């Protein structure tokens, strides 16, 4: 029997503040709680799997007979960003946060970047990705400059207009930055942020974003699976997050709708191993932009896909749904990620329905469970498998 695991990360789909949320400035945040109240939120299939039965979830209506097993996962890494969240899902806890730059990057580093790219740098401070285009986009076009900005996350973001700086050139500049940003300046991600438009009112970010991540500090679930001869198919920004480490095939997507379509297509393919999917729009388009209505509608779109996907699952298939952090669209103190628990939903013909796993410490629960199911030794990874508790 072919064993396939479909692990889908709903990027930023948090389910309530973690105990240490106040230390991150995120006390009382709840992404699911915010969107579940909105009329656009219609998620009967997530409900059936047991989303609202998860420990501590007060939103929505519990189902009497969940079709999946479910848990609440608590992050052990000292961070709330995409890179650290995904590394922990893959079994690597980060005890120290990646460096952030609330005052902007050091002047000498920016000067070196200007020298190496031949472009002046504008901004160099934490900024909203859409607001930075309004405030600096026109000047960047006049001066053929690059807009460099950061956020509360460990990121070095470079924005440029595609008409002046071709996408391949922007990617090259980001590779230069990635080479420079090591050690104490070793941010989690360097992100190319191409945009189009001519004026502050018409600028918009294109889908040609590209992330250059730090390499994980040690082998992750992806490496272990690949080394064991399994397929590791990265859909969406998974390849970028792991800097390609442990990936056997990558599929680039342009957003949730496209990512969902690729995932559905993968279901018809023969492979043995892991399809690791990231659906980024929840975070990028709706969480950071504090768009509750858009987030709720995106959840409903994913839920519609679930019905067909579950029907099409084969004998040896497992479906796992989780998140990497929160990004509460109703939280107005910041536009950053929020420190939240994440859901863990598992279903398949080989999974017992309705197993309430309570709260588990460490997103690495996922890596351990996947490795045990696929018969791969995961003793080097963080977390504990729950496979024996949920197998039918």
Language model: regions and residue ranges:
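Feature captures the catalytic ectodomains and active-site-proximal regions of enzymes
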Residues: 1-392
């Amino acid at each position: 029997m072919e064993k396939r695991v479909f692990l889908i990360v709903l990027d930023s789909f948090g389910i309530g503040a973690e105990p240490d949320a106040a230390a991150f400035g995120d006390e009382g945040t709840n992404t699911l709680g915010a969107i579940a109240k909105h009329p656009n939120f219609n998620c009967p299939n997530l409900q059936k799997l047991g989303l609202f039965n998860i420990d501590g979830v007060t939103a929505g209506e519990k189902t009497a007979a969940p079709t999946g097993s479910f848990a609440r996962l608590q992050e052990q890494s000292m961070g709330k960003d995409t890179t650290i969240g995904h590394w922990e899902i893959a079994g690597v806890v980060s005890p120290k946060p990646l460096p952030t730059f609330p005052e902007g990057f050091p002047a000498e580093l920016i000067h070196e970047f200007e020298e190496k790219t031949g472009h002046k740098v504008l901004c160099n401070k934490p900024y909203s990705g859409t607001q930075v285009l309004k405030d600096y986009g026109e000047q960047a076009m006049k001066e053929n400059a690059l807009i460099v900005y950061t956020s509360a996350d460990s990121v070095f973001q470079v924005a440029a207009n595609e008409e002046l700086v071709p996408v391949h050139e922007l990617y090259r500049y980001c590779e230069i930055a990635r080479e420079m940003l090591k050690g104490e300046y070793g941010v989690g991600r360097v992100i190319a942020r191409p945009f189009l438009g001519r004026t502050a009112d018409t600028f918009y970010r294109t889908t040609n974003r590209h992330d250059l991540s730090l390499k994980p500090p040690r082998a992750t679930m992806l490496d272990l699976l690949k080394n064991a001869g399994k397929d590791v198919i990265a859909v969406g920004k998974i390849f970028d997050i792991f800097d390609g480490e442990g990936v056997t095939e990558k599929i680039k997507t342009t957003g949730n709708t496209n990512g969902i379509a690729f995932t559905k297509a993968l279901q018809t393919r023969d492979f043995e191993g892991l399809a690791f999917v990231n659906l980024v729009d929840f975070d990028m388009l709706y969480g950071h932009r504090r768009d509750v209505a858009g987030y709720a509608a995106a959840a409903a779109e994913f839920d519609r896909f679930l019905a067909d996907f579950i029907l099409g699952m084969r004998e040896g298939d497992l479906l796992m749904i989780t998140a990497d952090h929160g990004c509460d669209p109703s939280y107005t103190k910041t536009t950053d990620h929020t420190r939240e628990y994440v859901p863990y939903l598992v279903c398949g013909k080989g999974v017992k329905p309705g197993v309430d796993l309570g709260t588990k410490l460490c997103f690495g629960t996922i890596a351990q469970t996947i490795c045990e199911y696929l018969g791969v030794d995961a003793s080097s990874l963080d977390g504990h498998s729950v496979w024996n508790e949920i197998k039918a």
